């Protein structure tokens, strides 16, 4: 009996040790919700072991082009207390789409290309998704997956223009939603000035340009622009707590500076007394509030590097 009991104990110890070995390194999938004054943080293992800085590709260029600066026009369109570009221009379905920058620090290109796509629809009635790949790989003034400047991106749209996604789709490797953002990052692919083989489009004839580009000197000017002409690109500083954003109006609370990130601003408003911008991120719908977030106006420099243009 004692021998049998000893064997049972030994087997239990072996199995326990084996189980521990199996579980080492596995995602816990645990969720910890923290309620801040204006927003909710949901801590998960989504960003564990990820070099988040590689996602944050906004790099101010020392050779940044000097753009026209727009100010608030008191005689222009009046600014409402809240605004949502998605509901204001319902026929432009790209406004509400959440993209996936995948294994690449291409946020600077996504913010520009998404906003320009929306504006082609709003102003020219063109329902065409501009190619992220064209800008990421062929904009020689920026550094592709290593990062870029939003101002340079819009200048490239003005000078060179981008082809459509139908001509040149985004082929940066992605990963399952549960692994967003991706663990491994890639080098920038080579520029291919040809449409994909199954497309009837011709690269040189499929270019879509911006006629004019500009930045802004105030929140009032930014909001008036969104109401008048549609979404804009905005770049800001990402801190550690932003990664766990889930809902509410984000206000930087804790954590270190991780880098610069660019997104698309689609609206604004006030929630519980806090003035905010509404933005679409490009980390898939698994992040944040189905891929979107609200951020306090002016927080983290969200009002400092904003750029847009007209076709």
From Swiss-Prot:
Signal peptide: 1-19
GO biological process, one term: proteolysis involved in protein catabolic process
Pfam assignment, any one: Peptidase_C1
Enzyme class: hydrolase
Gene3D superfamilies registered for this protein in UniProt: Cysteine proteinases (3.90.70.10)
GO cellular-component term (any): extracellular space
Domain of life assignment: Eukaryota
Keywords recorded for this protein, A-Z: Disulfide bond, Glycoprotein, Hydrolase, Lysosome, Protease, Signal, Thiol protease, Zymogen
InterPro entries: Papain-like_cys_pep_sf, Pept_cys_AS, Pept_his_AS, Peptidase_C1A, Peptidase_C1A_C
SMART domains: Pept_C1
EC nos: 3.4.22.1
Subcellular location: Lysosome
Family to which this protein belongs: Belongs to the peptidase C1 family.
PANTHER family linked: CYSTEINE PROTEASE FAMILY C1-RELATED (PTHR12411)
Name of the protein: Cathepsin B
Organism: Dictyostelium discoideum
The organism's taxonomic lineage, starting at the top: Eukaryota, Amoebozoa, Evosea, Eumycetozoa, Dictyostelia
């Amino acid at each position: 009996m004692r021998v049998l009991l000893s064997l049972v104990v030994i087997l239990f110890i072996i199995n326990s040790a084996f189980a521990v070995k199996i579980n080492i390194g596995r995602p816990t999938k645990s969720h910890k919700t923290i309620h801040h004054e204006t927003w909710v943080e949901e801590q998960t293992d989504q960003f564990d072991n990820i070099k988040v800085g590689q996602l944050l590709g906004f790099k101010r260029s020392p050779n940044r082009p000097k753009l026209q600066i727009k100010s608030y026009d008191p005689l222009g369109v009046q600014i409402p207390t809240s605004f949502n570009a998605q509901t204001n221009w319902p026929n432009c379905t790209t406004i509400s789409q959440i993209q996936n920058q995948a294994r690449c620090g291409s946020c600077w290109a996504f913010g520009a290309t998404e906003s320009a796509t929306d504006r082609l629809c709003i102003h020219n009635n063109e329902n065409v998704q501009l190619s992220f790949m064209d800008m990421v790989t062929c904009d020689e003034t920026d550094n592709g997956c290593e990062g870029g400047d939003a101002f340079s991106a819009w200048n490239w749209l003005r000078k060179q223009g981008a082809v459509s996604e139908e001509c040149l789709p985004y082929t940066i490797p992605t990963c399952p939603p549960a692994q967003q953002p991706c663990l491994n990052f890639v080098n920038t692919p080579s520029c291919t000035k040809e449409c994909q083989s199954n497309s009837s489009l011709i690269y040189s004839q499929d270019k879509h340009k911006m006629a004019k580009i500009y930045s802004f000197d105030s929140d009032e000017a930014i909001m008036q622009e969104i109401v008048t002409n549609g979404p804009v690109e905005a770049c800001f500083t990402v801190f550690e707590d932003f990664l766990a954003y889930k809902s509410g109006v984000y206000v930087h609370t804790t954590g270190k500076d991780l880098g610069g990130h660019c997104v698309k601003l689609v609206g604004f408003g006030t929630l519980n007394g806090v003035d905010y911008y509404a933005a679409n991120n490009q980390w898939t719908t698994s992040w944040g509030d189905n891929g979107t977030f609200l951020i306090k106006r002016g927080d983290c420099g969200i009002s400092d590097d904003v750029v847009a243009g007209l076709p």
